[in-house]
UniProtKB/Swiss-Prot annotation:
Complex formation: Homodimer.
EC number: 6.1.1.3
Protein location: Cytoplasm
Protein name from the UniProt record: Threonine--tRNA ligase
GO biological process: threonyl-tRNA aminoacylation
Keywords in alphabetical order: Aminoacyl-tRNA synthetase, ATP-binding, Cytoplasm, Ligase, Metal-binding, Nucleotide-binding, Protein biosynthesis, RNA-binding, tRNA-binding, Zinc
Amino acid sequence: MVAITLPDGKVRQFDHPVTGLDVAKDIGPGLAKAALAITIDGEMKDLATLIDRDVNLSIITAKSGQDALELLRHDAAHVMAEAVKELYPETQVTIGPSIENGFYYDFARPTPFTPDDLAKIEARMAEIVDRDEAITREEWDRDAAVKFFEDAGEKYKAEIIASIPADQKIGLYRQGNFIDLCRGPHLPSTAKLGKAFKLMKLAGAYWRGDSRNEMLQRIYGTAWFDKKELDAYLHMLEEAEKRDHRRLGREMELFHQQEEAAGSVFWHKKGWTLYRAVESYMRRRLEANNYEEVKTPQLVDFSLWEASGHADKFSESMFTIKTQDERHLAVKPMNCPCHVQIFRQGIKSYRDLPLRMAEFGSCHRYEPSGALHGIMRVRAFTQDDAHIFCTEDQITSETIAFCQLLKEVYTDFGFTDVRVKFSDRPAKRAGSDETWDKAESALLEASKAAGLETVLNPGEGAFYGPKLEFVLRDAIGRDWQCGTLQVDFVLPERLDAAYVAEDGAKKRPVMLHRAILGSFERFLGILIENFAGRFPLWLAPTQVVVATIVSEADDFAREVEATLKAAGLRVELDLRNEKINYKVREHSVAKVPVMLVVGKREAESRQVAIRRLGSQNQEIVALDQAVATLAAEATPPA
């Protein structure tokens, strides 16, 4: 007998081995028609997988969320590769995974693909869907698989398979005349893919991601379960392009970047004003929550990174220097080992804990040129970093306090939709399994006490401990991982951090690594795109522009400017001999939230015309009233 336990706890008994499709049919014809794949004891498998033992099973349909989408997109990559091989037989296939919101496949061919080619490939994909080709898994001996692909002129596939141990069976998937190396799972047929897909763009990619290898051609695409979802995604992309922080950064004169300092940011006056507004806000928040702000060195002897374990995990991302006296230094990629050095100065008592140590720490990490993206992916960045040294008994209370602070900060910046991931132990880690068991248990219990609903993010913890990842959803539905909280029993041990416990014994503190923004640069990029440059008044680099209609109003305009500045507002004065409509357009492009327009009549009556960004209307009010209203609006959150 084979006992199949379903997600609702019901058990179905079979007197013979069955496939996932058999189980779906046994439940009902509607489910059998909708079924795409199955999970067996949590692992996704093909619908045709034969089950000959007792298992926990769930059936994947189009309504199964991200698992179903990843399955669909993986199949879209294979169907695209099949279409390319039919249209351009001389092309060699390499790899084609699903990725966030889509898929890609890398191809090797002498002639570059063109946008016209993408249209042809997309049309052929639709034909393959109409053919309803069965997708079946086959297991081959490794050497036979290598020979098959070599004979087919597919040297890249042959190279991948040749790197697999000789005694390991190779999984291949066949659809029509197309055969590809793949772990699976896949849909049961090409018809299940549907036609809510689109090929998006072309790009270059090195074979195996190594710049010493051949350059391949990558085709990106997206796939969804229905056209409505596809259209919504394409609309979001259009909106995202309008909000691109790189374009708005230029238009608003916030920052620029150039090749001579790749991965770094040249902050212009307005951009630096925005940066400092965020920094000042965060500093007030930290002070109100009893954090000690510190500053640690940029250059630190490499031996500290070896002692901490970072050298083993991050050496390829670190900028290092050999000095004239043969010292090996590293520009710090993170702040945590340096904070431990401050903690170790002097004797610490249990009465000193929790000790909350914060730093707006400048860090540097090497990123490949192709991975750099505006100010969101850089090599030089500043973290809103803090480390809480506490006892094991204080983990829960400190987690609750941090989560409350994080929620308040995100709300003040306009983010109310926040999801939380729990990232457990990675394969490559420091510390014993016992230490990790304790750390994971402590963080899970603390997150529950803080009222958090977490989703497991397996294997994505830091090398020294598990972590919570806080993911913001922006105005157009995109997710951004920003905040983190990590429980660390390892680093205090490695770097010999200790405190005197109540019984006089020497004990290791627990170290909570936490950040809210992540990095200032990336968070500012997110803010620019979330608000499309239309910042709330308290954040706007220039909060008010005072613009004249006629030169007779210049003196009054200067008085308005001075009065606003005295009230703490960031003001620009525009006395140029230009038409007011021209001035309005120019300052609208710069996303200035408020314009105060003054002409001869306003100067005589000591009034101003308030014109807000995006509105065609203006309100005539007395100067004192305007200043009071705007000063209140521009006051940063407490």
